[in-house]
């Protein structure tokens, strides 16, 4: 049986738009875990907090479930897929209304031993 060298964590239905989350994920893809966490700490963005939490969860999964070393881990894959959209309406003049889409995201972070 092949040895497991990667671990994954997901955050589902997070109240941040996927487009904004992808901007943050592009910053950390391919970096080692320590650098990625440092980058996320100094990114002034709601999505950065969520991605940081998910990354820490993936690292914990790697250490506890698969016995991998934190120092050897690299962020190999990150993606943000669209979750369910909450549809709301904003009242406008003359009895009309404009739609508001409150988007959610499914964030996935995969760490791999280099």
From Swiss-Prot:
<dbReference type="InterPro" id="IPR047867">
    <property type="entry name" value="Ribosomal_uL22_bac/org-type"/>
</dbReference>
<comment type="function">
    <text>The globular domain of the protein is located near the polypeptide exit tunnel on the outside of the subunit, while an extended beta-hairpin is found that lines the wall of the exit tunnel in the center of the 70S ribosome.</text>
</comment>
<comment type="similarity">
    <text>Belongs to the universal ribosomal protein uL22 family.</text>
</comment>
<dbReference type="InterPro" id="IPR036394">
    <property type="entry name" value="Ribosomal_uL22_sf"/>
</dbReference>
<comment type="function">
    <text>This protein binds specifically to 23S rRNA; its binding is stimulated by other ribosomal proteins, e.g. L4, L17, and L20. It is important during the early stages of 50S assembly. It makes multiple contacts with different domains of the 23S rRNA in the assembled 50S subunit and ribosome.</text>
</comment>
<dbReference type="Pfam" id="PF00237">
    <property type="entry name" value="Ribosomal_L22"/>
</dbReference>
<dbReference type="GO" id="GO:0006412">
    <property type="term" value="P:translation"/>
</dbReference>
<comment type="subunit">
    <text>Part of the 50S ribosomal subunit.</text>
</comment>
<dbReference type="GO" id="GO:0022625">
    <property type="term" value="C:cytosolic large ribosomal subunit"/>
</dbReference>
<dbReference type="InterPro" id="IPR001063">
    <property type="entry name" value="Ribosomal_uL22"/>
</dbReference>
<keyword id="KW-0699">rRNA-binding</keyword>
<keyword id="KW-0689">Ribosomal protein</keyword>
<protein>
    <recommendedName>
        <fullName>Large ribosomal subunit protein uL22</fullName>
    </recommendedName>
</protein>
<keyword id="KW-0687">Ribonucleoprotein</keyword>
<dbReference type="GO" id="GO:0003735">
    <property type="term" value="F:structural constituent of ribosome"/>
</dbReference>
<dbReference type="GO" id="GO:0019843">
    <property type="term" value="F:rRNA binding"/>
</dbReference>
<dbReference type="InterPro" id="IPR018260">
    <property type="entry name" value="Ribosomal_uL22_CS"/>
</dbReference>
<dbReference type="InterPro" id="IPR005727">
    <property type="entry name" value="Ribosomal_uL22_bac/chlpt-type"/>
</dbReference>
<keyword id="KW-0694">RNA-binding</keyword>
